Amino acid sequence: MAGFWSKIFGNDEKPSSAQTAKDRLKVIVASEQGLGRRLSQDKIDQMKKEIMQVVSRYVRGVDEDHIQMQVRSEANIEMLEMNINLPEER
Protein backbone atom coordinates (compact mmCIF):
# COMPACT_ATOMS: atom_id res chain seq x y z
CA MET A 1 0.00 0.00 0.00
CA ALA A 2 2.90 2.36 0.70
CA GLY A 3 4.01 1.96 -2.92
CA PHE A 4 0.59 3.12 -4.09
CA TRP A 5 0.78 6.37 -2.09
CA SER A 6 4.39 7.07 -3.04
CA LYS A 7 3.44 6.75 -6.72
CA ILE A 8 0.64 9.27 -6.28
CA PHE A 9 2.37 11.81 -4.05
CA GLY A 10 5.93 11.32 -5.19
CA ASN A 11 9.19 10.07 -3.79
CA ASP A 12 12.90 10.40 -4.52
CA GLU A 13 12.88 7.97 -7.46
CA LYS A 14 12.75 8.77 -11.17
CA PRO A 15 9.39 9.97 -12.50
CA SER A 16 6.93 7.09 -12.68
CA SER A 17 4.27 6.36 -15.24
CA ALA A 18 1.91 8.36 -13.02
CA GLN A 19 4.12 11.42 -13.58
CA THR A 20 4.14 10.72 -17.30
CA ALA A 21 0.34 10.70 -17.20
CA LYS A 22 0.43 14.32 -15.99
CA ASP A 23 -0.10 13.47 -12.32
CA ARG A 24 -3.65 12.40 -12.95
CA LEU A 25 -5.47 10.32 -10.37
CA LYS A 26 -8.52 8.43 -11.54
CA VAL A 27 -10.81 6.49 -9.25
CA ILE A 28 -13.84 4.54 -10.36
CA VAL A 29 -16.41 3.08 -7.98
CA ALA A 30 -18.64 0.57 -9.76
CA SER A 31 -21.99 -0.82 -8.67
CA GLU A 32 -24.78 -2.91 -10.08
CA GLN A 33 -27.11 -1.34 -7.51
CA GLY A 34 -27.83 1.92 -9.36
CA LEU A 35 -25.54 4.68 -8.09
CA GLY A 36 -27.45 7.35 -10.00
CA ARG A 37 -30.53 6.69 -7.91
CA ARG A 38 -28.58 6.79 -4.64
CA LEU A 39 -26.23 9.73 -5.32
CA SER A 40 -27.90 13.08 -5.78
CA GLN A 41 -25.90 16.00 -7.17
CA ASP A 42 -25.77 17.43 -3.63
CA LYS A 43 -24.14 14.24 -2.34
CA ILE A 44 -21.65 14.23 -5.22
CA ASP A 45 -20.79 17.89 -4.51
CA GLN A 46 -20.28 17.10 -0.80
CA MET A 47 -18.02 14.14 -1.66
CA LYS A 48 -16.03 16.39 -3.98
CA LYS A 49 -15.43 18.92 -1.18
CA GLU A 50 -14.41 16.23 1.30
CA ILE A 51 -12.06 14.54 -1.18
CA MET A 52 -10.52 17.93 -2.01
CA GLN A 53 -9.84 18.52 1.70
CA VAL A 54 -8.07 15.16 2.04
CA VAL A 55 -5.98 15.56 -1.14
CA SER A 56 -5.07 19.14 -0.13
CA ARG A 57 -3.42 17.79 3.04
CA TYR A 58 -0.83 16.04 0.87
CA VAL A 59 -0.69 18.04 -2.38
CA ARG A 60 -0.55 21.83 -2.50
CA GLY A 61 -2.54 23.81 -5.03
CA VAL A 62 -5.50 21.46 -5.48
CA ASP A 63 -8.84 23.24 -5.68
CA GLU A 64 -12.39 22.22 -6.50
CA ASP A 65 -11.89 22.98 -10.21
CA HIS A 66 -9.25 20.22 -10.36
CA ILE A 67 -11.79 17.53 -9.38
CA GLN A 68 -14.39 16.19 -11.81
CA MET A 69 -16.96 13.59 -10.75
CA GLN A 70 -19.70 11.95 -12.77
CA VAL A 71 -22.01 8.96 -12.63
CA ARG A 72 -22.11 6.96 -15.85
CA SER A 73 -23.39 3.58 -17.01
CA GLU A 74 -21.49 0.93 -18.91
CA ALA A 75 -22.65 -2.66 -19.53
CA ASN A 76 -25.43 -2.50 -16.89
CA ILE A 77 -23.00 -1.23 -14.25
CA GLU A 78 -23.19 2.33 -12.94
CA MET A 79 -19.88 3.96 -12.08
CA LEU A 80 -18.91 7.00 -10.08
CA GLU A 81 -15.88 8.29 -11.95
CA MET A 82 -13.58 10.84 -10.34
CA ASN A 83 -10.64 12.59 -11.97
CA ILE A 84 -8.23 14.73 -9.97
CA ASN A 85 -5.78 16.78 -11.98
CA LEU A 86 -2.81 17.39 -9.73
CA PRO A 87 -0.92 20.66 -10.25
CA GLU A 88 2.59 20.58 -11.69
CA GLU A 89 5.31 20.06 -9.10
CA ARG A 90 7.45 23.15 -8.62
Swiss-Prot record:
UniProt feature, compositional bias: Basic and acidic residues: 10-21
Gene3D superfamilies per record: Cell division topological specificity factor MinE (3.30.1070.10)
Disulfide bond positions: none
SUPFAM superfamilies membership: Cell division protein MinE topological specificity domain
Region of interest: Disordered: 1-21
Keywords: Cell cycle, Cell division
InterPro entries, alphabetized: MinE, MinE_sf
GO terms (BP aspect): cell division; regulation of division septum assembly
A Pfam family assignment: MinE
Task of the protein: Prevents the cell division inhibition by proteins MinC and MinD at internal division sites while permitting inhibition at polar sites. This ensures cell division at the proper site by restricting the formation of a division septum at the midpoint of the long axis of the cell.
Family (UniProt): Belongs to the MinE family.
Protein name: Cell division topological specificity factor
